[in-house]
Amino acid sequence: SAAAGELTTVEAGKLTMATNATFPPYEMTTDAGEFEGIDIETAQAIADKLGLELQIDDMDFDAALLSVQQGKADIVMAGVTVTDERKAVMDFSDSYATGIQSIIVPEGSDIASPDDLAGKKIGTQRGTTGYIYCTDDFGEDAVVAYDSGLTAVQALNNGQVDAVVIDNAPAKEYVAANPGLKVLETSYAEEDYAIGMAKGSSLEDVVNAALEELKADGTLQSIV
């Protein structure tokens, strides 16, 4: 594996990861204020392979995507889906997990499939693929963007929106914590998660090599 001396990172000796730690089970904060989740463990394993200390910076999802573009973080991991728009402004590692966009509705809702979202108010998290897909499919007027998935779910509970479109993993957690809500069986979309980096980042090859090793030795499968 690459020696840390050869790697240029935002802060010498550290792998700085931008994330949005409101996204269980990929990243969340424990009651003690520590970060945990699939992305955190994967980033830690990569940092270990590269001989770097992992530094985690928590911020809004939008800001996390921008931070690598602005050279404030080395990588962004926040359940980030590879899209053509994002590829235009950043580079991505190989995929390390698959995500599903799901629809949360109240019990008894007449929304039973993605098509039923037409004419409804849809809550999403700003900057996410759920937001992008919904605005593409139903227009910006139909979609309300919130700072976090949690806020979107609160708006659904309060009747401000008719449904929330968000990744399946946090969707299940939010529904478990909010009686009266359910996740539709039909998914809205499927997508690949990857690690985002600045355009032309020198880390891309070593991060992919580390991911390859973590897949080969079973570490990644045990995390995801």
Model-flagged regions — what are they?
Residues 80-88, 133-135, 157, 161-189:
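A ligand-binding cleft/hinge motif common to bilobed small-molecule-binding domains
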Residues 21, 97-105, 168, 172-212:
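Periplasmic-binding protein-like
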Residues 15-19, 114-127, 142:
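Short loop->beta-strand "edge-of-pocket" segments that line small-molecule binding or catalytic clefts
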Residues 2-5, 129-146, 182-187, 209-224:
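Ligand-binding clefts/hinges and TM-proximal coupling segments of bilobed small-molecule sensing domains
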Residues 40, 56-67, 109, 126-129, ...:
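Short helix-initiation/N-cap motifs at beta->coil->alpha
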Residues 40-49, 121, 128, 194-224:
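Extended ligand-binding regions for polar small-molecule ligands
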Residues 44, 53-116, 182:
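Acidic, polar ligand-binding/catalytic clefts
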Residues 4-79:
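Extracytoplasmic small-molecule ligand-binding "clamshell" domains
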